[in-house]
Amino acid sequence: MKKDYIKIIDKIANWMNQTLTEAKSNGFVYGVSGGIDSALICAIASKFFKDRSLAVRLDIFNSVNDTKDANLVISHFKVNSVDKNLEQVFNTFIKDLPDNKLALMNLKSRLRMVCLYYYAQTYNYLVCGTSNADELYTGYFTKFGDSGSDFIPLANLTKTDVRECSKILGVPSQIINKDPSAGLFENQKDEDDLKVSYLEIDNFLENNPISESSKNRILDLHKISEHKRNMPKTILKLGEIIK
């Protein structure tokens, strides 16, 4: 069945507005990375929340292309925005820490989250996450990093859905067609990390047939990332402990 993406976009915008109203929030803040997911949020912000949103471009040794693409998205949609360079903060933070590539990559995402929440609290805004359904199901996000948000409008959109909505809202084609990347290191590509394509994840989430090996890979990613999607595990109630 063909999806009505115009209706989907309207439903998302209405849900976002309801979320802000319930929280008695003045608006929302979101990071713009140069990727398609944050570009779609930027497009929605421009169309429905022009004066109640703030795009933040957060630089921590970003690639030249990601910086250009983030600036393109912000200028294209003419949204309220600020730039914040966190490279000095990052360098100071890691100065006396042991070297660990994965921890350093995730630190970038966590520093960005901290900065977004600073702006959010300053303006009585909520932090808008940009993760899509594929990323959330497979755990392809940084715990307390890009997952650190108050609401996630794209949570039930597959990567294909994100692309189709982006086309409708006029996201530049170079953003839609670029290889998905978290941008945490040079030449990084999401599908290389996931070891499965977004199309296969999309089909899995839509209950369409995929290869058994891809299905097992997706299920394994979901299983090992379960802790990322839940609140911190708590101990039993005292009454149950001392039985």
Swiss-Prot record:
Please list the reactions this protein catalyses.
Answer: deamido-NAD(+) + NH4(+) + ATP = AMP + diphosphate + NAD(+) + H(+)
Q: What's in the GO CC field?
A: cytoplasm
User: What EC identifiers does the entry list?
Assistant: 6.3.1.5
Q: Which SUPFAM superfamilies match?
A: Adenine nucleotide alpha hydrolases-like (SSF52402)
* Residue sites binding Mg(2+) per the record: D37, E135
Top EC class, one word = ligase
Q: Which Gene3D superfamilies match?
A: HUPs
Report the pathway entry: Cofactor biosynthesis; NAD(+) biosynthesis; NAD(+) from deamido-NAD(+) (ammonia route): step 1/1
Q: Which InterPro entries does UniProt cross-reference here?
A: NAD/GMP_synthase (IPR022310), NAD_synthase (IPR003694), NH(3)-dep_NAD(+)_synth (IPR022926), Rossmann-like_a/b/a_fold (IPR014729)
The yes or no answer to whether the keyword Nucleotide-binding is present is yes
One Pfam family named in its UniProt record = NAD_synthase
Biological process (GO), any one? NAD biosynthetic process
One annotated GO molecular function is: NAD+ synthase activity
Q: Which family does it belong to?
A: Belongs to the NAD synthetase family.
HAMAP family assigned to the protein according to its UniProt record, in alphabetical order: NadE_ammonia_dep (MF_00193)
Q: What does this protein do?
A: Catalyzes the ATP-dependent amidation of deamido-NAD to form NAD. Uses ammonia as a nitrogen source.
Q: How does it assemble?
A: Homodimer.
Q: What is this protein called?
A: NH(3)-dependent NAD(+) synthetase
Q: Which gene encodes it?
A: nadE
